[in-house]
Amino acid sequence: MGQMTVQIVTPDGIKYDHHAAFVLVKTVDGEMGVYSGHEELIAVLEIGEMKVRRVDDENHVDWIAVNGGIIEVNKDIITVISDSAERERDIDISRAERAKLRAERELEEAQTARNIDMEMRATVALQRAINRIRVGKH
């Protein structure tokens, strides 16, 4: 099995840079798995988990909370560009749970006030918090 280079880039810089045998991401069209030699493409990512099976240890999987963005597959180089991304080991679950509660309160307030913009922001914040909790518990 071949290997790929996987990089995740955010406005804060490179958040992840490793060799991988397999990558799984959530795109707007559904889940997409990528192996070495995959057809070149660019796809839009949803808020979701990114699974990276490393080449240095067949059983080692890195989980990353990705908050949307794009993925580019070009030969055996995978680049993800996202507003933010956080590895499983770096997630503070209690902080993410507090963010979830805050987003739920904001969503309820927005629905009561019938404020669509506020509701959309709260919904995204809730999705991000849930994603971070899910990834942090792997």
From Swiss-Prot:
It is found in: Cell membrane. GO terms for molecular function: ATP binding; proton-transporting ATP synthase activity, rotational mechanism. Keywords: ATP synthesis, Cell membrane, CF(1), Hydrogen ion transport, Ion transport, Membrane, Transport. Its main location: membrane. The keyword Signal does not apply. InterPro entries: ATP_synth_F1_dsu/esu, ATP_synth_F1_dsu/esu_N, ATP_synth_F1_esu_C, ATPsynth_dsu/esu_N. One of its GO terms (cellular component) is plasma membrane. It is a peripheral membrane protein. PANTHER family: ATP SYNTHASE DELTA/EPSILON CHAIN, ATP SYNTHASE EPSILON CHAIN, CHLOROPLASTIC. F-type ATPases have 2 components, CF(1) - the catalytic core - and CF(0) - the membrane proton channel. CF(1) has five subunits: alpha(3), beta(3), gamma(1), delta(1), epsilon(1). CF(0) has three main subunits: a, b and c. Produces ATP from ADP in the presence of a proton gradient across the membrane. Belongs to the ATPase epsilon chain family. This is ATP synthase epsilon chain. It comes from Streptococcus suis (strain 05ZYH33). The lineage of its organism: Bacteria, Bacillati, Bacillota, Bacilli, Lactobacillales.
